[in-house]
Amino acid sequence: MAIKSIASRLRGSRRFLSGFVAGAVVGAAGAGLAALQFFRSQGAEGALTGKQPDGSAEKAVLEQFGFPLTGTEARCYTNHALSYDQAKRVPRWVLEHISKSKIMGDADRKHCKFKPDPNIPPTFSAFNEDYVGSGWSRGHMAPAGNNKFSSKAMAETFYLSNIVPQDFDNNSGYWNRIEMYCRELTERFEDVWVVSGPLTLPQTRGDGKKIVSYQVIGEDNVAVPSHLYKVILARRSSVSTEPLALGAFVVPNEAIGFQPQLTEFQVSLQDLEKLSGLVFFPHLDRTSDIRNICSVDTCKLLDFQEFTLYLSTRKIEGARSVLRLEKIMENLKNAEIEPDDYFMSRYEKKLEELKAKEQSGTQIRKPS
């Protein structure tokens, strides 16, 4: 589906884009856990039997072998938590907290590998083989770049419980730019909470009927989402009296260029909750003054030149030869992008290192 048609459909629906509206506070839990609590409650017993329970035999019979379990309980890791969909082999939601200190450090993703989550039973897990040759990338919900402070935290983001099948261009492009904006928020907000996850939204057919259908990949039938969502909650500081800032966004799982603005994909929190079946930040006092993050902040993503310069700067560290390093500079010039001071300092430092290394190698190979 084209970006324009999706965006126009979302903008055209008053129910979907009803503005910055707070939803009702309702507890959210896994279906198995909810069922267990429901049938164990005295009120539920009365509803089922038409009378107040008194240790009835019916209750004992129902619970004799237990209720079905869905595995949707919250699973906590070093810097993220998630609820896992055992049927679709993807997370339902992933919650993370980021701050200026957490996005800085020595943790490096080159030491991390995608792997099944050891906490997920293999029967319900996705595997790397499901993604190989599928035409879909392994897309992080909690990104590795938000966990530079801890090698363990970063490695845990590579568990496949934190991954969904994502369009390659979306993963490396628009979604990446949203993640970068979340990190940028830590320059202006002390605490930033982010919830991300997949959506499978209905499509309207020519006959007017709505259909939910989605591709699955691999032997384990990992579900490919039609859309991805991200909810951002930012707090200026723990002692600030300034209202919290919140924004919810839904983007299609397909390539998105540089022209669409993030605000074009903004939805109300209430509408996202209806779509996802989730209640976000249930302990948040929604009767308090909560601001639209796109009004308080910019919601501005990096443009083409800024993003290209950022990627080129990252490539400097991976250059293994002077020739490769000079190619990075050449590509920038061909794109008519002017290097900034930070890029030049990194470039010159790397150039000096590589020249010294190549000169040292030449001297070692020189015959005596």
From Swiss-Prot:
Cellular component, GO, one term: mitochondrial matrix
Transit peptide segment: 1-41
EC number(s) given by UniProt: 3.1.30.-
Residues binding a divalent metal cation, per UniProt: 171
Active-site residues per Swiss-Prot or TrEMBL entry: 140
Outcome when changing residue 137 to D: No effect on catalytic activity
Main location: mitochondrion
SUPFAM superfamilies per the UniProt record, alphabetical: His-Me finger endonucleases
Record note on what altering residue 277 to V does: Abolishes catalytic activity
Name of the top EC class for this enzyme: hydrolase
Subcellular locations according to the entry: Mitochondrion inner membrane
Keywords: Endonuclease, Hydrolase, Membrane, Metal-binding, Mitochondrion, Mitochondrion inner membrane, Nuclease, Transit peptide
GO molecular function: 5'-3' exonuclease activity; endonuclease activity; metal ion binding; nucleic acid binding; RNA endonuclease activity; single-stranded DNA endodeoxyribonuclease activity
Known cofactor(s): a divalent metal cation
CDD domains: NUC (cd00091)
Entry annotated with the keyword Metal-binding: yes
Stored InterPro entries: DNA/RNA_non-sp_Endonuclease_sf, Endo_G_ENPP1-like_dom, ENPP1-3/EXOG-like_nuc-like, Exog_C, His-Me_finger_sf, Non-specific_endonuclease
PANTHER family associated with the record: ENDONUCLEASE RELATED (PTHR13966), NUCLEASE EXOG, MITOCHONDRIAL (PTHR13966:SF19)
Subunit note: Homodimer.
Free-text function comment from the UniProt entry: Endo/exonuclease with nicking activity towards supercoiled DNA, a preference for single-stranded DNA and 5'-3' exonuclease activity.
Additional free-text comment from the UniProt record: The active site contains 1 hydrated divalent metal cation that has only 1 direct interaction with the protein; all other interactions are via water molecules.
Name the record gives this protein: Nuclease EXOG, mitochondrial
Gene: EXOG
